[in-house]
Amino acid sequence: MKTVVFPGSFDPVTLGHIDLITRASKLAERVVIAVAVNTSKRTLFNLNERCDLLSEATAHLSGIEVIPFSGLLADFAKEHNAQALIRGIRGTTDADYELQLAQVNKALNSELETILLPANAATGFISSTVVKEVFKHNGDIDPFAPPCVKQALLIKHSENS
């Protein structure tokens, strides 16, 4: 497979995301990380910060591009000549939701497939919300997020203090 798209808000990127991106990079020559401009979500990190964190966290991988997007994911995938979307699933609730989204994206772009990757057991419980909550309560986020995220959270915390 030549190109896949891995979409998300990544607020912030976690080791679960990095695991999925690493696995996706073994399936395709090019992985486009589509960072969502989601106006309905209030994010801790702005779009540029989220893109920068992803670029830093994936610098060790080849064939990775980090690109912000808004609008329909099916259109974005087509613009970037992607054959498939990569979506991580942590359980049956995620699977049900992702299957619905896959059908919508297929209806919008008949050439587009969706690949559901089960989360790794070691990272499947990690979410961006978990990272932010553990950090907020002075917990160690090293097992959950790349080092650049810890630094960014420390900076964000000092700016807000």
UniProtKB/Swiss-Prot annotation:
Pathway: Cofactor biosynthesis; coenzyme A biosynthesis; CoA from (R)-pantothenate: step 4/5. The record marks 17 as: Transition state stabilizer. InterPro entries: Cyt_trans-like (IPR004821), PPAT (IPR001980), Rossmann-like_a/b/a_fold (IPR014729). It catalyses: (R)-4'-phosphopantetheine + ATP + H(+) = 3'-dephospho-CoA + diphosphate. It is found in: Cytoplasm. It comes from the Bacteria. Substrate binds at residues 9, 41, 73, 87. Its cofactor is Mg(2+). GO terms for biological process: coenzyme A biosynthetic process. Homohexamer. This is Phosphopantetheine adenylyltransferase. It comes from Psychromonas ingrahamii (strain DSM 17664 / CCUG 51855 / 37). The gene is coaD.
